[in-house]
Structures are given as C-alpha cells and as structure tokens.
Amino acid sequence: MNSFPWLTIFVVLPISGGSLIFLFPHRGNKVIKWYTIFICIFELLLMTYAFSYYFQLDDPLIQLTEDYKWIQFFDFYWRLGIDGFSLGPILLTGFITTLATLAARPITRDSRLFHFLMLAMYSGQIGLFSSQDLLLFFIMWELELIPVYLLLSMWGGKKRLYSATKFILYTAGGSVFLLMGALGIALYGSNEPRFHFETSANQSYPVALEIFFYIGFLIAFAVKSPIIPLHTWLPDTHGEAHYSTCMLLAGILLKMGAYGLVRINMELLPHAHSIFSPWLIIVGVMQIIYAASTSPGQRNLKKRIAYSSVSHMGFIIIGICSISDMGLNGAILQIISHGFIGAALFFLAGTGYDRIRRVYLDEMGGMATSMPKIFTTFSILSLASLALPGMSGFFAELIVFFGIITGQKYLLMSKILITFVMAVGMILTPIYLLSMLRQMFYGYKLFNAPNSYFFDSGPRELFVSISILLPVIGIGFYPDFVFSLSVDRVEAILSNYFYR
C-alpha cells in the first residue's frame, strides 16, 4: 500500500477547495472563476507530478493503492488505486475540467454555486476512475450525478428543466441496476459484503447468475455511455446545457460508462462478457449507422454534435467487445481521443452562440468571413472528428478495425460484415460534419446583424482551442503515448480471459 495518500488528495482537494468558494463575496465573479481555475491547475500539476514519479508504466498491477477502513459498522473500506487503464481518463478529467472552467464566460447568476458544482463534479469523476471498491464506485457514480443535474437545470436554454429531468430519470434508473449488481456480487457466497474489486475478480459465479449481474451493470453503463436505445437523454441534454457543462459531459461523463464496461463487466464477469460481446458488437455497428444517419436531420447545432458523439461511442463498444489486444487498446485510444474532440466541438459551438445567439443551423451562414479563427479551428476539429489521418481519431478507429479483423473470437464472414458496415458508418460521418460546416460558415448571413456580435476568437478562446488541438494532433502522430499507458494492463485483462 502506498505510504502517501496521493489519490485521496486528488479526490478530496477539488470539492474541499470548492467549499471555500461560499466564503467569497457574491459579486466577485472574476475572483471566484480564477480561484476555481487555480484549484484545477494545481490539481492537474499535482497529478502529473505524482504519476510521473510514482507510477510505473511497465507494471500492469494496481498502483498507488490506498486501503482504509471507513465505516466500522458496515465494514466499508476507502479503497483507491490506479493502473494503466485508469490513468488516461484521470488525466483527461483534469485537463478538460481546467479548460471547461477557463472557457466559461463570466457567470452572473449564482456564480459561487456554478463553480462549486464544477469542482464537485471533478472530485466525483476522479474518485470513480480511481475506485477499487464496488460500493465506493457506486458512491462516486452518484456523487457525480448531483452536480450535473444542478448544472443542467440552472444554467442553459429554455428547456433546461426538461432536459435535466430527463437526464436524472435515465441515470437514476440506471443507478438502481448498478447498485443491485454491486450488492449481488458483494453478497454472493458470503454473509458479509465483499466489495473489493480484486476479491470479486477472483470469484467464480454460476453462468446464469453471472449473466444476471452482467445485464444489471450493462443497463447502468449503457445509459451513461450511451448505448442505443438508452441514448435519448443525450441530444436533449447537450441541446440545452451551458457549453462548459457540455464540455464536461462529452469529454468525461460519457467515458465513465465505457470505463465501467471494461472495469466491471469485462474484468469481473468475463464469461458473461464473452457471451454478450457478439450481440453488443451488432448494437455498436447499428449505433454508428443510426447516429450518423440521424445527425444530418438535426437543426440544433449542439444536437447534431451530440449524435456524432453517439456514433463515435459505437467504435468504443466494438473495441471493448472485440476481446482482442488491438481492439481494446483502440477503444481506450478512442475514449481519450473523443474526450478531446467532443469537448472542443461543444466549446466552439458555444463561442459561436455567444456571438450570433443562434442554435439552429438553418438560421446561420456566412460566418467564415467575419470569424476566420473560429472557422479555422472548427474546421480542423471537425476533420479530426471524421478521423482525418494525422489526427487522434484516425488511429483510434483504424486500430478498432484491426482489432475486429485480427480477433480470434469471430468467424471470417462475421468480421467482413462488421467491418463493411463500420466502413459505411465512416462514410456517413463526413456527410453530416461537412454539411454542418457548410451551413454555419459558407453562403450568406441569415441572421439579423443588429443582434449579433461579429468579433473573432479572443485570447481566452484561442488558448482553449489550441490547448485541445495540440494533444489531438500529437496523439495522431504519436499514438504510442496513449498505448504506453494501457498496453500492459490490456494484456493483463485478456491474458487468462476464458480460463477463470
């Protein structure tokens, strides 16, 4: 066990530092914002230092472990630890949260609460990615939902209460299945609950019971990922949310579902996962085609980007269910890649809204001449989203392809059919993304000039855009940076996959 509680500090620091915000004057908006940014940057630098000096990349085991008895009566432990799989999402969380806080224009209404909720969400996400205990995982899952609901319901569009209510109903419903699965695994074969991931991973279950547990966890993670048909909350939520909240939703929140699929469904329930994988691959392929076909019909800019997120999550599902080293590494790379690209697209959509006060694509047009910097960055990141070579999304989708082709689980004809349909989905992606660019930036201005503000990106917006664009290009040219974190852990997950 690690002698210094690094992970506990990373979990507690944002929410405890955020609690001090309520001591600030109510009208000190800039002070509150820069204080929040300071906490985010300090946390990110501290994580980078700790992981650089104390994390061994070639060790597939759980590192920086902490194991403290928290509640004596319930025999509940505070168990934290990270491996190569969780390291990437944790660093992504720190990076995107920092930029989302910087990206937000000054919030004039309840500024203290807004920034506190951003930091509380930060703590919940770090806690979830570093949890090594099923009950702690569930607590962090729920802790993260409360700030998201409040951010959605208090700041956003006219239908924000509807979208927030839809979000909480879907996610709370999924959480019931998550809790049932966690309690079922913990209480199986014992009168005392055993929530430790390591203990659960070494436990064998009757096939029918393992399938029952798997379905419960799958429903919870399918809502959050999202997986069709449990995705309908996502377009409404993104369509109404403040763009800083959208950055956190697209960049981090959706990745929690994919993380849970690997950490719990794949690691703890391998036999059930091998049974469900072919069916989930079919769902993933359908999701790519469905979302790519539905996206062009969306008038709302943020809803169109939201459907592109649903489509890209299909590649993650396929990579996870390929049950191959290459496929799972590709899924992890797609998690990181889409975290950057999705957050950036929603940020740029928000900057455009700040200027023209329009969200419907058929009311836009001709923005390229008056806002060339926004046009350039939006175009580059849209090309990254459609997997242009040299961008992170290209290698992520390509390696998922190779993972399916080289995997040993599926027959040749099945592989050919899956890759063909995936290729069709990739062909549809440029259609809705390039159409979106055409409607926004080309042609004549369709909106009223007196109500619009034709100034281009300022230093803050350029900094945020470039900060996200650099890792997208960097990973596109050197994907081994991400693979060096995950490859050993992926081998450990798959090493004895069918022999437990």
UniProtKB/Swiss-Prot annotation:
Cellular localization per UniProt: Plastid, Chloroplast thylakoid membrane
Family label: Belongs to the complex I subunit 4 family.
Keywords: Chloroplast, Membrane, NAD, NADP, Plastid, Plastoquinone, Quinone, Thylakoid, Translocase, Transmembrane, Transmembrane helix
Taxonomic path: Eukaryota, Viridiplantae, Streptophyta, Embryophyta, Tracheophyta
Keyword Iron: no
Major subcellular location class: plastid
Organism: Manihot esculenta (Cassava)
Pfam families attached to this UniProt entry: Proton_antipo_M (PF00361)
Name of the molecule in the record: NAD(P)H-quinone oxidoreductase chain 4, chloroplastic
